[in-house]
Curated annotation (Swiss-Prot):
Residues 59-73, 177-189, 258-269, 281-294 have a biased composition (Pro residues). Keywords: Activator, Host nucleus, Host-virus interaction, Inhibition of host innate immune response by virus, Inhibition of host interferon signaling pathway by virus, Interferon antiviral system evasion, Modulation of host cell cycle by virus, Modulation of host PP1 activity by virus, Phosphoprotein, Transcription, Transcription regulation, Viral immunoevasion. Residues 317-332 have a biased composition (Basic residues). The gene is EBNA2. Plays a key role in the activation of the host resting B-cell and stimulation of B-cell proliferation. Acts by up-regulating the expression of viral EBNA1-6, LMP1, LMP2A and LMP2B genes, as well as several host genes including CD21, CD23 and MYC. Activates transcription by acting as an adapter molecule that binds to cellular sequence-specific DNA-binding proteins such as host CBF1, SMARCB1 and SPI1. Phosphorylated. Residues 55-98, 175-454 are annotated as: Disordered. The lineage of its organism: Viruses, Duplodnaviria, Heunggongvirae, Peploviricota, Herviviricetes. Belongs to the herpesviridae EBNA2 family. It is found in: Host nucleus matrix. Signal peptide: none annotated. Interacts with human SMARCB1/INI1, presumably generating an open chromatin conformation at the EBNA2-responsive target genes. Interacts with human WAPL. Interacts with host CBF1; this interaction allows transcriptional activation by EBNA2. Interacts with host general transcription factors GTF2B, ERCC2 and ERCC3. Interacts (via PXLXP motif) with host ZMYND11/BS69 (via MYND-type zinc finger). Interacts with host EBF1. Residues 359-368 have a biased composition (Polar residues). This is Epstein-Barr nuclear antigen 2.
Amino acid sequence: MPTYYLALHGGQSYNLIVDTDMSGNPSLSVIPTNPYQEQLSNNPLIQLQIVVGENTGAPAPPQPPPPPPPPPPPERRDAWTQEPLPLDMNPLGSDASQGPLASSIRMLCMAQYLLRNARGQQGLLRPLGPQTRSQVTLERQPVHNPRQEAPIILLQSPAPPRFTPVPMVALGHTLQPTPPPRPTLPQPRIPLIIPPRHTNQPATTPPTAPQRLTLGHQLSLPPHPPPHQSTPHCSSDSTGLPPPPTSYSIPSMTLSPEPLPPPAAPAHPLPGVIYDQQALPPTPGPPWWPPVRDPTPTTQTPPTNTKQGPDQGQGRGRWRGRGRSKGRGRMHKLPEPRRPGPDTSSPSMPQLSPVVSLHQGQGPENSPTPGPSTAGPVCRVTPSATPDISPIHEPESSDSEEPPFLFPSDWYPPTLEPAELDESWEGIFETTESHSSDEENVGGPSKRPRTSTQ
């Protein structure tokens, strides 16, 4: 069915005409009843969607399928632990036994039970409120006994005048109805105390048979206490009654020591990472520069490497070369880059001296025959016609090896030396043995080509 989209002014009246054109398709024409008002209207445009076709209830059937999604929630076994959906019209449910309402009540009860256990209250909830309050106070009384150790020690002290000012009341269970208004004052923390028996047994009276002493509150006692209150402690006259409020600071000290405040934090923090970093010297250069070690350890390391240099050079030459001449060429060539280094150790010099004497002996002579026997195999392995390039440029590279380094020599780790790095990159483009054999002729570059042509 064709669909038309129109934009018309709100509050206007239009004539909608549906017709069929020449090709049989429906044609729509919307004509305003007042064309002049249409042009001058300030009302906003309203988008309309007009579907031309038979008047059938086709869009109604797709709406019933959305109701089937509600059945899946009953299938979930963990529905009691889930929050209700925001689109649910009846979040509490209608079922009294397994609905969300019953499960939410269970969740609330369980949360309250966990909260009470976390606070130290064990057991199930008591059904009546006033009973729980009285029982909780009775349970707390034995817990506070360790706080009252100091008053018991004071009862054992022999000094009699200290006890008369302290307003301590000894009441039996028979005399408890006499002070009903006293526990209403705001100091319910003082529980029952059982003093030692040997001090109070000779002076006991009939009302104090249960041997339980209840400490009175400091503000609840009258200025003149009854005679039965002072008799269990000590026999004293009524003249010591005025000083009680002045010397009553002792019980307040007994309650303070247990809830001590936490220790104060140290004024200066312990030495940590920041303190260790202050001890380290600042690294030279920008922060991205690699760490530069002190020059003292690096000056000691090169001689050990220079001793190992020729041996490593021989090993690499033998791996790469195909004959003895190539291995010897590596051995002669490798110590040369180490000459401009900072430290030329004495053990490496005896290895360098025969090489220099070999080239010096061949320099003044025009024929290679009077030279030492070590040069014999070298002459046999020079068949190429392009040996002039390497002997001319090799000594220049060996003499000017210090400037082209990207990093200072101290930065390289002890296992890698600048000379070893250059040696490892030299043999990349070697395709023939002539290049390595000509490296030996650094001392006399102009003599070897003539021998090959002769």
